[in-house]
Amino acid sequence: MGYRNGNYAAFYVSEPFSESSLGANATKDFVSYNMLRAWKGKDNNYPFNDSHDKTYNVRDGSDWEKTLKPRLRKRLDQSKNIIFFLSKHTENSKALREEIDYGINVKGLPVIVVYPELSEKSDIIDCTTKVFRSEVVNLWSRVPVFKDSMLKVPTIHIPYKKDQIKKALENKDFMINSKISAGSVYFYPC
């Protein structure tokens, strides 16, 4: 097995996946992932090491059991955490369920949840009561395996801001070999 130094980006793309025309770019979660890649492309020191680059690309026409699922798992096997883009556009697709289930329940990978539609910490939590906003809690139900499993690993919730994502990517508490205890959800204070 390779080094576990990658960041596995989990995001929804409509199925069947197609990069042609609008294709994947019509899916907001995929656009958010591509922005993360652009930040890395512009600044080589940006701490994103894309696990999707660790194996060759597969296309949606590939066999799920023989090609797609093993490829997702191999990428997760080489990852230190999951960056999960969760929005009102996220759907409970087969691939996303597999990524989250295998990543959390088998590999124990910490999760950095990024909310592409939220730009402030106060959009995620009530800064006075330190309680998650109902809009955020409702998003967790879009991928039930995530909602049911997130307390099994360290999970941090952050808005879609370059500096906040960078801070989470650099935070050793959310890396497989140095992770903090599971059972709580975390967020950076307001």
UniProtKB/Swiss-Prot annotation:
Superkingdom field: Bacteria
Gene3D superfamilies, A to Z: 3.40.50.11200
Keywords: Antiviral defense, Cytoplasm, Hydrolase, NAD
Listed EC numbers: 3.2.2.-
GO MF, one annotated term: hydrolase activity
Subcellular location(s) of the protein: Cytoplasm
Pfam assignment, any one: ThsB_TIR
Disruption phenotype: When this gene is missing the Thoeris system does not confer phage resistance in B.subtilis.
GO cellular component terms attached to this protein's record: cytoplasm
Main location as per UniProt: cytoplasm
Single Gene Ontology BP annotation: defense response to virus
Regulation: Activated upon phage infection.
Signal peptide: none
Subunit structure as annotated in this protein's UniProt entry: Homodimer.
Assigned protein family: Belongs to the Thoeris B TIR-like family.
Biological role stated in the UniProt entry: TIR-like domain-containing component of the Thoeris antiviral defense system, composed of ThsA and ThsB. Expression of ThsA and ThsB in B.subtilis (strain BEST7003) confers resistance to phages SBSphiC, SBSphiJ and SPO1. Phage infection activates this protein, generating a signal molecule that in turn activates ThsA. Probably hydrolyzes NAD(+) to make a cyclic ADP-D-ribose (cADPR) signaling molecule; might make 3'cADPR.
Protein name: Putative cyclic ADP-D-ribose synthase ThsB
